[in-house]
Curated annotation (Swiss-Prot):
Record-annotated site: Transition state stabilizer: H186
Alphabetical list of NCBIfam families matching this protein: pgm_1, PRK14115.1, PRK14120.1
Organism annotation: Streptomyces coelicolor (strain ATCC BAA-471 / A3(2) / M145)
Keyword terms, alphabetized: Gluconeogenesis, Glycolysis, Isomerase
Transmembrane segments: none
Entry keyword Isomerase: yes
Enzyme class: isomerase
Gene Ontology molecular functions: phosphoglycerate mutase activity
Name of the protein described by the UniProt record: 2,3-bisphosphoglycerate-dependent phosphoglycerate mutase
InterPro entries: His_Pase_superF_clade-1, His_PPase_superfam, PG/BPGM_mutase_AS, Phosphogly_mut1
Pathway as given in its UniProt record: Carbohydrate degradation; glycolysis; pyruvate from D-glyceraldehyde 3-phosphate: step 3/5
Length: 253
């Protein structure tokens, strides 16, 4: 077992096609845009420039995160390291909101309900029918999951609940070996992890936004608590600007 500090890097996938269109995405599997591919590559360049080179990657089973990991590793010349994919790192399932325009949803339901669905810790959107257009209930990549583990909607509390077992069972053991671990995932699965790492309250987590394509570096002590609370963005100026853009999602038409 290696001694602390342990090195952890979080990377939200680059801009996706539905990010660009301002649609709720969730478990719908969409590609990166050309801009998103550039963001992912830039993320890898930032890792290389900082000398923060991952030894292993954990990502979701959604191609926007998988592709982000691939592009970042290519840019950092670390394309040869192990990559582990798991559904527990998937984006939050947005239920019946999946595929809906955020600005139209805001206009239809009002800001209070919109923000409750989007940012509250424990209020999920309406459930998505199993046979709906944007349902993943019959997706073959989830065939091994019992029905009760295939969500039809989720709040962030649900994401924390399904993500933490993977953190303890898969990511922590890699950190304990002294490996630098890259988690390439999604806005809400990463918010769930940051909530756990930084001990953010259920109320305060609503204000946390994570930008696309900018690595967030943590050093963790022996109890896996941050030595740098909140983490350190490898491009702080770009991160600050991108966080403002994330805050304004839903207002864009």
């Amino acid at each position: 077992m290696a001694d602390a500090p342990y090195k952890l890097i979080l990377l939200r996938h680059g801009e996706s096609e539905w990010n660009e269109k301002n649609l709720f995405t969730g478990w719908v599997d969409v590609n990166l845009t050309p801009k998103g591919e550039k963001e992912a590559t830039r993320g890898g360049e930032l890792l290389k420039d900082a000398g923060l080179l991952p030894d292993v990657v954990h990502t979701s089973v959604q191609k926007r995160a998988i592709r982000t990991a691939q592009l970042a590793l290519e840019a950092a010349d670390r394309h040869w390291i192990p990559v582990h994919r798991h559904w527990r790192l998937n984006e939050r399932h947005y239920g019946a909101l999946q595929g809906k325009d955020k600005a139209q949803t805001l206009a239809e339901f009002g800001e209070e309900q919109f923000m409750l669905w989007r940012r509250s810790y424990d209020t999920p959107p309406p459930a998505l029918d199993r046979d709906a257009e944007y349902s993943q209930f019959s997706d073959p990549r989830y065939a091994m999951l019992p029905p009760e583990l295939r969500p039809q909607t989720e709040c962030l509390k649900d994401v924390v609940g399904r993500m933490l077992p993977y953190w303890f069972d898969a990511i922590v053991p890699d950190l304990l070996t002294g490996r630098t671990v890259l988690v390439a995932a999604h806005g809400n699965s990463l918010r769930a992890l940051v909530k756990h790492l930084d001990g953010i309250s259920d109320a305060d987590i609503a204000g946390l936004n994570i930008p696309t394509g900018i690595p967030l570096s943590y050093e963790l002590n022996a109890e896996f608590k941050p030595l740098n609370p909140g983490g350190t963005y490898l491009d702080p100026d770009a991160a600050a600007a991108a966080i403002e853009a994330v805050k304004n999602q839903g207002k864009k038409k």
